[in-house]
Amino acid sequence: MALTSIFGGSSSSSGTPATSSPSDVKTQLKSQISQELAIANATELVNKVTENCFEKCLNAPYAASQDNCVDQCLAKYMRSWNAISKAYINRIQQASVNGEI
């Protein structure tokens, strides 16, 4: 993505000035940052789950009984992830209401 599109400009070189207000630009930037953080967090979760659960549960030679260990490990990670995410979102919302961000 070109920086000009982030700041309200077009990627073409038509030379027309950007018509976005500063608040629109700020909103667009916040939205883009939020999306990028969500992707980074999801990627980190997948990497940690893969690293920890598969290392803990899967041994050579593979046995079908190891599936249960992986399932339980994944479920535990997802429960923890959801609890942490809810707490984080609540803190961000509270900070926003208080004008801290």
Swiss-Prot record:
It is a peripheral membrane protein. Residues 1-27 are annotated as: Disordered. Pfam families: zf-Tim10_DDP (PF02953). Residues 1-23 have a biased composition (Low complexity). GO terms for biological process: protein transport. Its main location: mitochondrion. It is found in: Mitochondrion inner membrane. GO terms for cellular component: mitochondrial inner membrane. A motif (Twin CX3C motif) lies at residues 53-73. Disulfide bonds join C53-C73, C57-C69. Keywords: Chaperone, Disulfide bond, Membrane, Metal-binding, Mitochondrion, Mitochondrion inner membrane, Protein transport, Translocation, Transport, Zinc. It comes from the Eukaryota. GO terms for molecular function: metal ion binding. Belongs to the small Tim family. Heterohexamer; composed of 3 copies of TIM8 and 3 copies of TIM13, named soluble 70 kDa complex. Associates with the TIM22 complex, whose core is composed of TIM22 and TIM54. Interacts with the transmembrane regions of multi-pass transmembrane proteins in transit. Mitochondrial intermembrane chaperone that participates in the import and insertion of some multi-pass transmembrane proteins into the mitochondrial inner membrane. Also required for the transfer of beta-barrel precursors from the TOM complex to the sorting and assembly machinery (SAM complex) of the outer membrane. Acts as a chaperone-like protein that protects the hydrophobic precursors from aggregation and guide them through the mitochondrial intermembrane space. The twin CX3C motif contains 4 conserved Cys residues that form 2 disulfide bonds in the mitochondrial intermembrane space. However, during the transit of TIM13 from cytoplasm into mitochondrion, the Cys residues probably coordinate zinc, thereby preventing folding and allowing its transfer across mitochondrial outer membrane. This is Mitochondrial import inner membrane translocase subunit TIM13. It comes from Kluyveromyces lactis (strain ATCC 8585 / CBS 2359 / DSM 70799 / NBRC 1267 / NRRL Y-1140 / WM37) (Yeast).
